[in-house]
Amino acid sequence: MEIDFFNSQCQSVSNKKRFGLCDEQDDKEPAYLDERNGAKWIAVVENDELKEVHFIAIDYCIEIWRDDDPTKMEKRCDGMLWYETSIIFVELKDRVSKKDKNAWVEDGEKQLKCTIAYFEKTEQSDKFTEKRVYIANKAHPTFKESQLQRMKNFKQETGYTLRIENRIKIPSY
């Protein structure tokens, strides 16, 4: 059965110049768009042209059941932004890994790849020409280590551009 990523109760819209994406990390609630409380923002969306940008929570909102075990839920990313013909899948992190400094990146990458794989099986994916993903971590707003090879591999495997940062720019064309 095809998953409808756009028929979600967990959808909000903003045309503000700056707004944030939030996720209360330990509760079982969906991520959400916030226009007021910057202290809670894990990712900051910069929307200089005031475009109408939609956010749809995926984790804890859209059910994606595993193919190999239909009684278990698949790992999903936190949500997606879309506007015009662009789509951006987002994984929000707010933690530092003490043991492995890349663990949160690897974890986020797996969640994004899994969600994208299901999205690409839908006809809905055909209407988007620009496809990006972000792994945003409030504890690491800019990632120090070069991830160029990881980003190149991600693009080759999925067709999506990967960014590891917590500033999401809505470009002007």
Name each model feature, range by range.
Residues 51, 97-104:
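Intrinsically disordered, low-complexity coil segments
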Residues 1-71:
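Basic, amphipathic N-terminal segments that precede the first structured/catalytic domain
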Residues 2-10, 132-173:
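Domain-level recognition of nuclease-like catalytic cores that cleave nucleotide substrates
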Residues 95-99, 140-143:
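Short acidic, S/G/P-rich loop/turn micro-motifs used as interaction or catalytic elements
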Residues 79-81, 86-97:
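Conserved catalytic cores of phosphodiester-cleaving nucleases, focusing on short active-site segments
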Residues 59-67, 73-76, 82, 124, ...:
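Electrostatic, structured charged patches in enzyme active sites and in nucleic-acid/phosphate-binding
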